[in-house]
UniProtKB/Swiss-Prot annotation:
UniProt entry keywords in alphabetical sequence: Arabinose catabolism, ATP-binding, Carbohydrate metabolism, Kinase, Nucleotide-binding, Transferase
Catalytic activity line of the entry: D-ribulose + ATP = D-ribulose 5-phosphate + ADP + H(+); L-ribulose + ATP = L-ribulose 5-phosphate + ADP + H(+)
Protein name from the UniProt record: Ribulokinase
Organism field: Staphylococcus aureus (strain MSSA476)
Protein family per UniProt: Belongs to the ribulokinase family.
Enzyme class: transferase
Lineage, highest ranks first: Bacteria, Bacillati, Bacillota, Bacilli, Bacillales
CC per GO annotation: cytoplasm
InterPro entries attached to this UniProt entry: ATPase_NBD, Carb_kinase_FGGY, FGGY_C, FGGY_N, Ribulokinase
Coiled-coil segments: none
GO MF, any single term: ATP binding
GO terms, biological process: L-arabinose catabolic process to xylulose 5-phosphate
EC number(s) given by UniProt: 2.7.1.16
Name of the gene this protein is made from: araB
Pathway(s) served: Carbohydrate degradation; L-arabinose degradation via L-ribulose; D-xylulose 5-phosphate from L-arabinose (bacterial route): step 2/3
Length: 545
């Protein structure tokens, strides 16, 4: 009997799972919030811009060390039977280190410098740099930009590197290596300096055939090309391959065998496809958490405007992986729950239920459109298909009779409409969607929301029993790297998670949602394209004030 470890680094917490490689059984698991959380409003008592989202990399090591120690001890499994470790991580979450892979934010002189810290995926401080990259690529007719949806996001690696170059050159001077935090964990485990094709391909303008797009970087600033060449470029390991064995010192520290193999890191949402068993084209998978990623696989590379990228072999060898997404989903619902009136909070507490459960109870019998509300779910910008992190959310139709649960439902519907925009974009560019999978903690807990999605999309929705699908997917890659399975497909078939339930659309609800979706699309186009300056002008007052 063999086992593999899957370590899942999410936005707010980390998870370490021990998985049976034969049947996918979860033998032991460890879940812990990051000690320093997400650093958003202040750093060590100093105020930071509202567009910033940072983390302390020491939290990642804490998760790994405490988690592995716990699952080995709790499971009583012989460490010699643990054949591999897989890592998934939010992305693009980037880290700046010295030549020994020590994060520069640990240097005393940079303790209070936000640019020394990990830049989390939802850090939007590099929006000006992203715009410059985009405009330069368009002016120079860089046709390969179509592989990235004809857009550049401030969430990606290169804009974040430019941000540090422009605003904190002293950090760049002390930095030897820049990498995805997922690559950093893999390198710490193996004492190597490699990069995953998944992270580079989706977030750093790197392609297997051509490497980095220095043609663009040179036009921006020759110094940028040199930074990428000296600090980012490294040997690339593809998903499905092995990076190597655990470093001897790390094996001793973690209590694992020195023969344990380590796989390259995979982006967290992408790992979910493996965890739920989506291995084919014509299947769209929604990985739903603080944000939502909409993933598809295809044999061909299509240039789909507004998506986040397409990379060959980033999930399944020989297939192109496509990613689109929404920047605020779980975060948005949490925001709405925190605004609930005290009477709702008290009622939920008295009935021993969450505010979410109470609001779901209040809306579950409403018909689409009953509240008279419609919302734009851009509270953390719009990733797809507008690719504009500077957009903000709106709600329309409020009256003096509007109740808090009506607002909640409007936001549930808004995220479903946003998903439909993405699905239609895939379909318009020759990628048919026959099946829709939903995975993550939210679908598992919120059947009301899933009913809304099924009827908005007008598709059968397959909800997976997969609150921890990324960790399972990471463990699958660990199993492959450790030789427990001959291929990713074999490992997926053996270890994937089961279906929880399925929902079929209802004709009357579908028809009503078609009317609402037309209104959503009209507002989407007005405030996203035609009159986007309205929101941005208001936001500029906030930035300047």
């Amino acid at each position: 009997m063999s086992y593999s470890i899957g370590i899942d680094y999410g936005t707010a917490s980390g998870r370490v799972f021990l998985i049976n490689t034969t049947n996918g059984q979860v033998v032991s698991k460890f879940v812990k919030p990051y000690t320093h959380g997400v650093i958003e409003s202040e750093l060590n008592g100093l105020k930071i811009p509202h567009t910033y989202a940072l983390q302390n990399s020491n939290d990642y090591l804490e998760i790994m060390e405490e988690g592995i120690s716990y699952i080995v001890r709790e499971s009583k499994i012989d460490p010699d039977n643990i054949v591999g470790i897989g890592i998934d991580f939010t992305s693009s979450t980037i880290i700046f280190t010295d030549e020994n892979l020590n994060p520069v934010h640990n240097l005393k002189q940079f303790k209070n410098n936000p640019h020394a810290y990990v830049k989390l995926w939802k850090h939007h401080g590099a929006y000006k740099e992203a715009e410059k990259l985009y405009q330069t690529a368009i002016e120079n007719n860089n046709k390969w930009l179509g592989h990235y949806g004809y857009n550049v996001s401030s969430e990606w690696m290169i804009p974040k590197i430019m941000e540090v170059m422009n605003r904190a050159p002293e950090i760049m001077e002390k930095t030897a290596y820049i990498m995805e935090a997922g690559d950093w964990i893999v390198n710490k485990l193996t004492n190597k300096n490699i990069r995953s094709n998944c992270g580079l391909g989706f977030k750093a303008f790197w392609e297997e055939e051509t490497g980095f797009h220095y043609d663009l970087f040179d036009k921006i600033d020759p110094k940028l090309s040199k930074v990428i060449q000296d600090k980012v470029s490294a040997p690339v390991v593809n998903i499905g391959e092995a990076v190597g064995k655990l470093d001897d010192k790390m094996a001793q520290k973690l209590g694992l065998s020195k023969e344990t193999m380590v796989s390259p890191f995979i982006i967290d949402a992408h790992a979910s496809l493996l965890g739920i068993g989506s291995e084919k084209d014509k299947e769209m998978t929604m990985v739903m958490g603080t944000s939502t990623c909409h993933l598809m696989l295809n044999e061909k590379q299509h240039q789909v405007p507004g998506i986040s990228g397409s990379v060959k072999g980033a999930i399944i060898p020989e297939l192109f992986a496509y990613e689109a997404g929404q920047s605020a989903v779980g975060d948005l619902f949490e925001y709405v729950a925190k605004q609930a009136p005290k009477s709702y909070v008290d009622e939920a507490a008295n009935r021993n239920m969450t505010v979410f459960e109470l609001m779901n109870e209040k809306i579950k019998h409403q018909m689409p459109g009953e509240s008279g509300l419609i919302a734009l779910d851009w509270h953390n910008g719009n990733r797809s298909v507008l690719s504009d992190s500077n957009l903000t959310g709106c709600i329309f139709g409020l009256t003096l009779q509007t109740k808090h649960e009506d607002i909640y439902r409007a936001y549930l519907e808004a995220t479903a409409f946003g998903t439909k925009m993405i699905m239609q974009q895939y379909q318009d560019w020759h990628m048919e969607v026959e099946k829709v999978f939903a995975c993550g903690g939210i679908p598992k807990k919120n059947a009301v929301m899933m009913d809304i999605y099924a009827n908005v999309l007008n598709k059968k929705l397959i909800v997976m029993d997969s609150e921890y699908a990324p960790a399972i997917g990471a463990a699958i890659l660990g199993a492959v790297s450790g030789g427990a399975h001959n291929s990713i497909n074999d490992a997926v078939d053996a270890m994937k998670e089961p279906i929880l339930y399925e929902i079929n659309p209802e004709a009357e609800k579908v028809q009503r949602y078609e009317t609402l979706f037309k209104a959503y699309k009209a507002l989407h186009d007005i405030h996203g394209y035609k009159k986007a300056n309205i929101m941005k002008d208001i936001q500029s007052l906030r930035v300047e004030g």
